[in-house]
Amino acid sequence: MRYTNAKVRENYSRRFSIRFPNEELPAARPQETTPLYDLMLRDNNAVMGDTWGLETPLWFAPSAGEAHDIPSFHRSNDFEHVGAEVRGVRERVGVTEIANFAKYEVTGPGAEAWLDHLMTNTMPRTGRLVLTPMLNDAGKLIGDFTIAKAGEGRFVIWGSLGASVYHMRWFEQHLPDDGSVKVHRFHMDLVGLSICGPRARDVLAALVEIDVSAGNFRFMDYREADV
């Protein structure tokens, strides 16, 4: 409620102010942070944004003195730095924090049949991923998920953070009465990093002991490994 009140007051106080593209406003921040917050903000000059109350990195400045947005209707001060980040990922490798994805674990002997009923797509084989929408009783889209089959009776799901409370409520309302399915929603107890770019596989290979070569770790494959 503190966050909502502060944001409502901030919005009302600026009702006649000019709002710039991509402008981030300060009220009630930081409301929630990830375990990587201090590392990104203080050690890597991150400029943070507000994603449904969660502090997430927008871009990284070369020095602490430059780590702030200057809102503009033209190219702002982040243009050069964001461009360098994009080129780095396109040409070499980069890391993106993905804490702003909702994460769930569905377990139990009835998990696969339940997900097949709840989602529009068929569940994948063990060690594979699938992308699938979720519809309500009227056939309207209410969610879009990435689902991995981690093992028999165990699925890991990624979805929208902003809709996570609604989605969890929908899951709970449609659980079978026999207790054959359990759903757990992770929050800041499980965050993630995405390694991306042409050299992503090289970086991952140096961090884990499993074989992540192209022949053994294909597109849409799912593996669990210790780092």
Describe the residue ranges of each PLM region.
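Glycine/proline-enriched, intrinsically flexible loops and inter-domain linkers
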Residues: 2-227
